[in-house]
From Swiss-Prot:
Location relative to the cell: Cytoplasm
Pfam families in the record: OTCace, OTCace_N
E.C. numbers: 2.1.3.3
Keyword Cytoplasm set for record: yes
Entry function: Reversibly catalyzes the transfer of the carbamoyl group from carbamoyl phosphate (CP) to the N(epsilon) atom of ornithine (ORN) to produce L-citrulline.
Protein name (database record): Ornithine carbamoyltransferase
Gene that produces this protein: argF
Pathway: Amino-acid biosynthesis; L-arginine biosynthesis; L-arginine from L-ornithine and carbamoyl phosphate: step 1/3
Organism: Neisseria lactamica
């Protein structure tokens, strides 16, 4: 998958530590075309000390990890975004001013994919109060929920899933969201998602529903918060929305900490 923040973060971090970096783009390499993932893993593992993979299938990064013989970092798949969780946990610790196991946060929107899944597991592992606010059909899979609940029993985390966005955000310190249509999905899906998720848009009213005047807004980016992108303008012209999952007012407010998070 394409990348701005994840690729830059890995490359800057590697070079800060004195490591060399090679970027292999799928369209300019043989990965998955003329050479299997298994064979690619065994070649790259002999040349490099570590591999970061960003793509669609979780099974691909797991196959790389199985055969490479070196550490493999998941830079994002459809199912998980673990390196983003490191950034999110650090950001909540920095801006929350208290231990993570005393911190509460909500994720509102489409919770079936990498951010919803990862935030649920993150909150469970760190003993946090984590809320998912989404239509029931857009919750994480039963397997992900069961895994999170099992971890929560050991860590003392509190897990709540609700279709009521106001209930989800009540009393939290942080409100997270993500785009409603993921990379690779067709434009035709937008109308369906807007109809499903319009009540989960992060507005000033939803922020106020937390009852916490210090509540912060988080988003892994990129965000559709205005008309300043080609897609943002297309959404406005097609559906009349200036900003989709979050309004410009919230995104640019002092509550927004998305650039520290990024």
């Amino acid at each position: 998958k394409t990348s701005t923040r994840t690729r830059c973060a890995f490359e800057v971090a590697a070079r800060d530590q004195g490591a060399g970096v090679t970027y292999l783009e799928s369209s300019a390499s043989q990965i998955g075309h003329k050479e299997s993932i298994k064979d690619t893993a065994r070649v790259l593992g002999r040349m490099y000390d570590a591999i970061e993979y960003r793509g669609f299938g979780q099974e691909t990064v797991e196959e790389l990890a199985k055969y490479a013989g070196v550490p493999v970092f998941n830079g994002l798949t459809n199912e998980f975004h673990p390196t983003q969780m490191l950034a999110d946990a650090l950001t909540m610790r920095e801006h929350g001013g208290k231990p993570l196991n005393q911190t509460s946060f909500a994720y509102v929107g489409d919770a079936r994919y990498n951010m919803g899944n990862s935030l649920l597991i993150l909150g469970a592992k760190l003993g946090m109060d984590v809320r998912i606010g989404a239509p029931e059909g857009l919750w994480p899979s039963e397997g992900i929920i069961a895994a999170a609940n099992a971890v929560a029993e050991e860590t003392g985390a509190k897990i709540t899933l609700t279709a009521n966005p106001q209930e989800a955000v009540k009393g939290v310190g942080f409100i997270h969201t993500d785009v409603w249509v993921s990379m690779g999905e067709p434009k035709e899906i937008w109308q369906e998602r807007i109809d499903l998720l319009k009540d989960y848009r992060v507005t000033s009213e939803l922020m106020a529903a937390s009852g916490n005047p210090q509540v912060k807004f988080m988003h892994c980016l990129p965000a559709f918060h205005n008309r300043e992108t080609k897609i943002g303008e297309w959404i406005y012209e097609t559906f009349g929305l200036n900003g989709v999952e979050v309004t410009e007012e919230v995104f640019e407010s002092p509550a927004g900490i998305v650039f520290d998070q990024a």
